[in-house]
């Protein structure tokens, strides 16, 4: 069965988590993605129980070049149709620019 989903990146905290909850409250099925499997699992169970929706997750670090393919393959293998994409994942450096290393700057730009 092909079921429509909203895919939310950076879904374990902050704006991403709030958006996932709001979409779930509207009856949307959700695919969560972030780096922390423990939080993804907890949130997935919570959204299913509270809003009676389908919810799944894929662990992915969008700073890695392979992450989009991993997410795409996960959705494809499970026959999930992504009808809404919330590209929320982000990375910040809590330093002044002149104090950052080249590695930190490269990670930030990805």
Task: Give the predicted meaning of each segment.
Residues 17-21:
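Residues forming the Rossmann-fold NAD(P)(H) cofactor-binding site
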Residues 83-84:
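Conserved catalytic-site loops of classical short-chain dehydrogenases/reductases
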Residues 5, 12-14:
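Conserved glycine-rich cofactor-binding loop
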Residues 26-43:
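Conserved glycine-rich Rossmann-like NAD(P)H-binding loop of the short-chain dehydrogenase/reductase
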């Amino acid at each position: 069965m092909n079921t429509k989903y909203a895919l939310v990146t950076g879904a374990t905290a902050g704006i991403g988590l709030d958006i996932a909850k709001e979409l779930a409250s509207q009856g949307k099925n959700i695919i969560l993605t972030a780096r922390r499997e423990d939080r993804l699992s907890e949130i997935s169970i919570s959204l299913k129980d509270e809003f009676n929706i389908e919810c799944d997750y894929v662990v992915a670090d969008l700073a890695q070049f392979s992450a989009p393919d991993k997410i795409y393959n996960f959705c494809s293998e499970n026959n999930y149709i992504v009808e809404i994409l919330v590209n929320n994942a982000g990375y910040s450096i809590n330093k002044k620019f002149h104090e950052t290393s080249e590695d930190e700057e490269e990670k930030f730009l990805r």
